């Protein structure tokens, strides 16, 4: 019998709650009718409300036109249409209202602009294989050695031209040069002070 009492109490409570809600709704509807009857007395107030509403809509449109950045990329204002651009999300409006996939934001795009790529053929990129990396390093090393040899050759030719004129001056008066050994005060050479 207690189960039946519980159900009856719940039904009574629901009825009271529904009655309270309907009374509140009726009171609010009465307030709205009164405000409609009095209306807006001034056209300037109405114009102000329309102006505020228009500003709000313009702000909303401007917000929806803001660009969305893909992960790992920067802002670019490209006017050309790519094949993948139709699938990607580029503005906040496309993100909120569009049916495009959000996963397109996570895709890292490869730079296709030749102006953005550096003209260094020895630069190692993440797409290079181990063999290509080894080849690029070998080519870079060969280039460095070639430059080094070229520099040494140019230094030796310059020093040879000066050496002929210097031989005459050296015979006239050669002074021995003294070189002193540099001393560094290293900590491990010093004896440690005894602790008291």
From Swiss-Prot:
<dbReference type="GO" id="GO:0000462">
    <property type="term" value="P:maturation of SSU-rRNA from tricistronic rRNA transcript (SSU-rRNA, 5.8S rRNA, LSU-rRNA)"/>
</dbReference>
<keyword id="KW-0687">Ribonucleoprotein</keyword>
<dbReference type="GO" id="GO:0000447">
    <property type="term" value="P:endonucleolytic cleavage in ITS1 to separate SSU-rRNA from 5.8S rRNA and LSU-rRNA from tricistronic rRNA transcript (SSU-rRNA, 5.8S rRNA, LSU-rRNA)"/>
</dbReference>
<comment type="function">
    <text>Ribosome biogenesis factor required for cleavage of pre-rRNA at A0, A1 and A2 sites. Essential for the incorporation of UTP25 in pre-ribosomes.</text>
</comment>
<dbReference type="GO" id="GO:0000472">
    <property type="term" value="P:endonucleolytic cleavage to generate mature 5'-end of SSU-rRNA from (SSU-rRNA, 5.8S rRNA, LSU-rRNA)"/>
</dbReference>
<comment type="subunit">
    <text>Associates with the 90S pre-ribosome. Interacts with RNA helicase DHR2 and RNA helicase-like protein UTP25.</text>
</comment>
<dbReference type="Pfam" id="PF10863">
    <property type="entry name" value="NOP19"/>
</dbReference>
<feature type="region of interest" description="Disordered">
    <location>
        <begin position="101"/>
        <end position="196"/>
    </location>
</feature>
<dbReference type="GO" id="GO:0005634">
    <property type="term" value="C:nucleus"/>
</dbReference>
<feature type="compositionally biased region" description="Basic and acidic residues">
    <location>
        <begin position="142"/>
        <end position="155"/>
    </location>
</feature>
<dbReference type="GO" id="GO:0005654">
    <property type="term" value="C:nucleoplasm"/>
</dbReference>
<dbReference type="GO" id="GO:0030686">
    <property type="term" value="C:90S preribosome"/>
</dbReference>
<dbReference type="InterPro" id="IPR022592">
    <property type="entry name" value="Nucleolar_19"/>
</dbReference>
<dbReference type="GO" id="GO:0000480">
    <property type="term" value="P:endonucleolytic cleavage in 5'-ETS of tricistronic rRNA transcript (SSU-rRNA, 5.8S rRNA, LSU-rRNA)"/>
</dbReference>
<keyword id="KW-0539">Nucleus</keyword>
<dbReference type="GO" id="GO:0032040">
    <property type="term" value="C:small-subunit processome"/>
</dbReference>
<keyword id="KW-0690">Ribosome biogenesis</keyword>
<feature type="compositionally biased region" description="Basic residues">
    <location>
        <begin position="179"/>
        <end position="196"/>
    </location>
</feature>
<dbReference type="GO" id="GO:0030490">
    <property type="term" value="P:maturation of SSU-rRNA"/>
</dbReference>
<protein>
    <recommendedName>
        <fullName>Nucleolar protein 19</fullName>
    </recommendedName>
</protein>
<dbReference type="GO" id="GO:0005730">
    <property type="term" value="C:nucleolus"/>
</dbReference>
